[in-house]
């Protein structure tokens, strides 16, 4: 494993994020087990899945996103196979950079699911992101020890759909794949790398990828539990109240993150 200087401030903050989230994982596991005792259709309203299926939407970075490497920050589109990127597990080599380009007719509108989401500078905390971060809607951020799709954090202010992209004729997404599912620093923010889940990949350069690695890919285990709603938020709140304990905080981890980030946006705007 490649190691980086311990004095690197961005990496130090990265490790603080990972360490802070570790203590919350046991709470989430307990909450998940409490909810799992119910076998009704509502019992899975909040999915906390160590082996979650992310669906077929792209999980990617926008063009120009700066990724921390062993030689500093590099735009994601300029990374190449073999480059070392900073992860919680040290500096690991890039396996592939996938490109997905979507185009629209000038007279048509983008489908809402295609539009990127902008995470504004310092939307998460006092240090992250260091600059505006643009992600596909299903792309996960590491918050409180779990991976949360950024679409669940949209508040219309500090985290919002990219209005500029609505007028663009093309939208590009870049996938950063390593040999395993990891979390890297994108604009200083802990964000997931691409994870094979067994579904179909729609990269422009898929043919080149298959020439190197073949068409069959092993499903990757996620770096951390992936949280997503598979039912309504109201259903989740009711289930969590039923599982409430004086000793265990079983609140919805997505709602906790959303509320904290939204409150921060209001405070910054004041």
Question: Language-model features: where?
Answer:
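N-terminal secretory signal peptides
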Residues: 1-13
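Short, positively charged, Ser/Thr-rich terminal linear motifs in low-complexity/disordered regions
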Residues: 3, 16-18, 26, 265, ...
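Generic anion/oxyanion-binding catalytic loop in active/binding sites
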Residues: 3, 34, 71
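N-terminal export signals
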Residues: 13-37
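Sequence-level preference for short, compositionally simple segments enriched
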Residues: 46-57, 171-270
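Long beta-strand-rich cores associated with HINT superfamily self-processing modules
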Residues: 59-73, 84-213
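Structural motif
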Residues: 77-83
């Amino acid at each position: 494993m490649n190691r980086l200087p311990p004095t690197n401030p961005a990496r130090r903050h990265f490790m603080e994020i990972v360490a802070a989230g570790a203590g919350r994982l046991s709470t989430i596991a307990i909450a998940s087990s409490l909810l799992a005792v119910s076998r009704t259709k509502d019992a899975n309203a909040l999915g906390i899945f160590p082996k979650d299926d992310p669906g077929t939407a792209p999980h990617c970075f926008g063009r120009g996103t700066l990724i921390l490497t062993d030689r500093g920050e590099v735009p994601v589109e300029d990374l190449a196979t073999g480059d070392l990127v900073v992860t919680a597990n040290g500096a690991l080599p890039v396996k592939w950079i996938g490109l997905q380009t979507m185009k629209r007719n000038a007279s048509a509108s983008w489908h809402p699911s295609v539009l990127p989401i902008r995470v504004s500078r310092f939307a998460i905390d006092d240090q992250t992101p260091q600059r505006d971060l643009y992600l596909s809607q299903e792309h996960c951020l590491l918050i409180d020890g779990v991976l949360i799709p950024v679409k669940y954090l949209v508040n219309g202010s500090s985290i919002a759909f990219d209005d500029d992209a609505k007028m663009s004729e093309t939208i590009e997404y870049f996938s950063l794949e390593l040999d395993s599912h990891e979390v890297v620093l994108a604009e200083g923010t802990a964000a997931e790398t691409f994870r094979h889940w067994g579904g179909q990949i729609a990269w422009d350069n898929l043919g080149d990828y298959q020439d190197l690695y073949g068409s069959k890919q092993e499903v990757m285990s996620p770096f951390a539990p992936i949280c997503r709603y598979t039912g309504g938020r109201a259903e989740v709140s009711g289930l969590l109240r039923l599982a409430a304990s004086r000793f265990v905080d079983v609140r919805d981890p997505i709602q906790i993150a959303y509320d904290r980030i939204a409150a921060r946006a209001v405070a910054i705007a004041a």
